Amino acid sequence: MTHELSPQLLESFSRDFNADPKNQVISRAARRSGLLEAAYNPAVSQRLNRTFSIELDTDNVTNQQQSGRCWLFSTLNVVRHNFGKANKAKNFTFSQSYNFFWDKIERANYFYDRIIATADRPLTDRTVRGYFDWCQTDGGQWHMAASLIAKYGVVPRYAMPESFNSNHSQALDMVLADKERKDALTLRRLAQADDQEKLEAARTDFLSQIYRIMATALGEPPKTFDLEFRDDDKNYHLDKGLTPVQFYKKYCATDLDDYVVLANAPDHEMNRVLHLGFEDNIKGGYPNLFINVPMEYLEDAAIAQLKDGEAVWFGNAVGRQMDRKTGFMDLDLYQLDQLLDIDSHLSKADRLATGIGESSHDMALVGVDVDGGQVRQWKVENSWGDKSGEKGYFTMSADWFREYTYEVAVQKKHVPAEILDLLKNQPIELDPWDSLI
């Protein structure tokens, strides 16, 4: 059956709209200020009061600017708060550009291997298409950042500061993606011809060119540096000639082996380990593993870690029911259904299954307000600079956390043993087009 939009049907839609006088009032407000502003609910500010019963002592916020490095910024924020606590230097900041440099090269290395491994498949194969489509994006996961830190260490921000291309990564991503896609066609042809000598030579040459691009765009990473800072008591510290790995092992009180990522993806089987191998970025690094569990496990573990004095990395759908100016995140922030007289409600599972729900952004939990055992609100450290929210910090309702948070990275000691035991089971391999991408 076909359904043509006839003039008569369209005219009936117009009559329905004009039959209710309030539609014209709503339309004038929406056209003047936009749908979101017209639907804004000021009562939210009365509930979210920016006071927290548990709150970490943090300082300056970071700014990823026009780049998709939230996963890296939020992971480094967790690590730097641990560093600040251990070394009494709460305003110390790591270089995000340093790890970003190595991430791009490691992604290219993994991409070339995936292309070679699937050379016998057509370019129209859905997995191959996924490799090409997602070549050299900025996005990532906790385990990707952990892999970079474990292999390359970290450096202070002053040792490799931000550049235009790290802050505004679109052009760099385009150059890398275009080059790697062209390289992929060459590697496929050589792999199909089973010419291993030429294949390895081409692969190595391509990686050398990727390094050159990154060194041109960001500068070469330091091999050693001098650690120099004043702590919160104004005491001077100097440690010369550290490598990035030495610095991390000596000064950073974060053992990455101690962490696990809990996920709440109700469109997937519960109490199973999921592997997002498509986003693994380092050969021999941490695989992107999630334990998919009910939401209360994520909430309980996050609270326990905050009580223990440590920030919590979390992946979420920040674009939903969030006001960048105030930093409020609440399910009733924009009452669009009431404004437009519609019902758009979907369950968390249905949002994921239909593509509406996605873990599009990563931030750090640095506080929580618990009253009588019930969570009221969370304090969130974003990486959008100090001009958004309350000097860069956002306030998130308990319901928003439950509906729009999909992952938290927490220490294993905060997770029940029966949940950790699930890691002993074979993980479910997720496709490149899975809803958790």
UniProtKB/Swiss-Prot annotation:
Segments crossing the lipid bilayer: none
Main location: cytoplasm
Molecular function terms, GO-annotated: cysteine-type aminopeptidase activity
Designated name of the protein: Aminopeptidase W
Coiled-coil zones: none
Keywords, alphabetical: Aminopeptidase, Cytoplasm, Hydrolase, Protease, Thiol protease
Subcellular location(s) of the protein: Cytoplasm
The keyword Nucleus is annotated on this UniProt entry: no
One Gene Ontology cellular component: cytoplasm
Family: Belongs to the peptidase C1 family.
Enzymatic class: hydrolase
UniProt-listed CDD domains: Peptidase_C1B
Active site: 70, 361, 382
Highest taxon of the lineage: Bacteria
Single GO BP term: proteolysis
EC number: 3.4.22.-
Pfam families xref list: Peptidase_C1_2
Keyword Zinc: no
Natural source organism: Lactobacillus delbrueckii subsp. lactis
